[in-house]
Amino acid sequence: MRRLLPGPDLEDPDLAQLYQYPPGRWLRANMVSSADGAASHEGATAALSSRGDRHVFALLRTLADVIVAGAATVRAERYAPVRRRELWDHLREGRPPTPPIAVLSARLDLDPASRLIASAPPHARTIVITTATAPPERRAELAERADVIVAGRETVDLNTAVDALADRGYRRLLAEGGPQLLGQLVAAGLLDELCLTIGPLLAGPGASRIVAGAVSPRPLPLRLAHVLEDNGFLLCRYVIKDHLSPNEPWCAPPPASSWGPRLRFSSAGAAWFTAAYSMGAAAGRAQTRSPRRRRGR
């Protein structure tokens, strides 16, 4: 056992280094939770966030090649195309100004006139991932305004979907929801990393867990890569155990520097230690990240 806090303060360049993707294809999920795992408090998620959390949320979107979400999450949260002013603009150098959003929908229950589809810029057209049995007329209608990928016959095959995205050059993936999608990613062995913000409050019972779907036969071991602290909010970054070696240069902490008031780094050298939790037990009940809910906090 060792004390992680307090640790050295960091500056934005150090923060960007902490969250850089490793080489190759990598799928990261981003969640938020109260200390007791609740998804919201009194119907809102504002109490679960902080300035530093929102700062990292924007960074994760900036670093991603594509943002992946399920159709139910997109409809419930009224997704819109990512706006350039929301990102760390200098970190997009050499890439399109904003990442596209990829929506998974087996039945294509999506509105072609929605902002997400109709207002997407040419460099980041919305991607719709569907099935071979989806209504052909709906597929043709959506294909006029979005890029459509067929992955699977009756249900979306996530391995095929992720391969198709990688073939298009989208190798750094960020999953923002929902719990069903995250559960399917875990079951398919596609999840590489979980970023989880834990807010310092007890919200009480009532929210769903971080992962939905079939019960896992055993807990999924995680490695804790780092913890950041922002006024009591803990920003944890876990990597699926054995997906990376502890000796990878990508795992090493940044140099200590004078950081500013927002976040503090709380990792012990390049060492890793295994989280003694499953994704459900570690996070309890958590909120998938959505731009609408986070802007409304």
Please name every model-derived segment.
Residues 247-248, 252, 256, 279-284:
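N-terminal compositionally biased or targeting/leader segments
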Residues 1-253, 263, 293-297:
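Enzymes that bind and transform nitrogen-containing heteroaromatic metabolites
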